[in-house]
Curated annotation (Swiss-Prot):
One of its GO terms (molecular function) is RNA binding. The keyword tRNA processing applies. Pfam families: TruB_C_2, TruB_N. CDD domains: PseudoU_synth_EcTruB. It is an enzyme of class 5 (isomerase). This is tRNA pseudouridine synthase B. Belongs to the pseudouridine synthase TruB family. Type 1 subfamily. It catalyses: uridine(55) in tRNA = pseudouridine(55) in tRNA. The active site is at D38 (nucleophile). InterPro entries: PsdUridine_synth_cat_dom_sf, PsdUridine_synth_N, tRNA_psdUridine_synth_TruB, TruB_C. NCBIfam families: TruB (TIGR00431). It comes from Listeria welshimeri serovar 6b (strain ATCC 35897 / DSM 20650 / CCUG 15529 / CIP 8149 / NCTC 11857 / SLCC 5334 / V8).
Length: 304
């Protein structure tokens, strides 16, 4: 079995739980997810099966869309609703214009510091391991892309009796929505946290494309594999090059290819090679031999 499943991860499960259960449902060990979702978050989680596991990094690199509920006036240890409250402040009136001004400032390339309760590694240990031991460590900042921030709940002012608002976030990989909630609060002059989160899109998969674990289980029992998308779905945004029989045979053996073959796509950092409509391999310019391209991943098996 090879392909990509757009899974709807339900609240209360870890991403690893989903992989474990799918291995049992699909009767295959080669299962990998494409970016962790916290247990209390539900949403789109593309799962790579079989040879598609070689594409996981490309699927992960694609943009994401989230719908978050952000609460002003309270901050927590984890930056979400699961943590202990560490700061509070009564809200004065915050106009929709003031909020929009902050959202505009945080659109584009921004710098984030990952939360202490996260899986980012420092000196070989995950940050949440330090946090659980009560140890604060210096966290590396990272630049992330925020493509758009759109308020979804109308234009009401925020105040003590109405401290929450809904926000749709379109962003690049590595963005912490919890941290974004805190940053919005800081610019407004208030403690804040992310009180709810749902991922409505991951790469090329939307909420309406998804299947739950129970739906996949039922479909498997009925020998219905319509939950499985072809490998080519994972490289939709990648530049493609059609190859012939002769080149195909070389690619299956992991051969270096002449740069002249890639003249139409020479400005690309990687190219998907397609033979008879199927993804065969992903190639990139050779770092030392400037007249050659080399395989980054050979996807199709050489069964000769």
């Amino acid at each position: 079995m090879n392909g990509i499943i757009p899974l709807w991860k339900e609240r209360g499960m870890t991403s690893h739980d989903c992989v474990f259960k799918l291995r049992k449902i699909l009767h295959t060990k080669k299962v990998g997810h494409t970016g962790t979702l916290d247990p209390e978050v539900e949403g789109v989680l593309p799962i790579c099966i079989g040879r598609a596991t070689k594409l996981a990094e490309y699927v992960t690199d694609e943009g994401k869309v989230y719908v978050a509920e952000i609460t002003l006036g309270k901050s927590t240890t984890t930056e979400d609703a699961t943590g202990e409250i560490i700061a509070t402040k009564d809200l004065a009136e915050i106009s929709p214009e003031a909020l929009q001004s902050v959202l505009t400032k945080l659109t584009g390339k921004i710098t984030q510091i990952p939360p202490m309760f996260s899986a980012v590694k420092v000196n070989g240990k995950k940050l949440y391991e330090y946090a659980r031991a009560g140890i604060e460590v210096e966290r590396p900042s990272r630049q992330v892309d925020i493509y758009s921030l759109t308020r979804l709940d109308g234009l009401a002012s925020l105040n003590e009796s109405n401290p929450t608002f809904q926000l749709e976030i379109s962003c690049g990989k590595g963005t912490y929505i919890r941290t974004l909630a805190v940053m919005i609060g800081e610019l407004l002059g208030y403690p804040a946290h992310m009180s709810k989160l749902e991922r409505t899109r991951s790469g090329f998969f939307k909420k309406e494309d998804c299947f739950t674990l129970s739906e996949i289980d039922e479909m498997m029992q009925a020998n219905d594999l319509n939950f499985l998308y072809p490998l080519e779905k994972g490289i939709e945004s990648m530049t493609k090059l059609i190859i012939d029989d002769e080149i195909h045979a070389k690619v299956l053996n992991g051969a270096l290819l002449p740069k002249a073959l890639f003249v139409s796509v020479e400005n690309e950092s990687r190219v998907a090679l397609i033979f008879e409509g199927k993804l065969t391999a992903i190639y990139k310019p050779h770092p030392e031999k400037k007249d050659l391209w080399k395989p980054e991943k050979v996807i199709e098996l050489n069964e000769a």
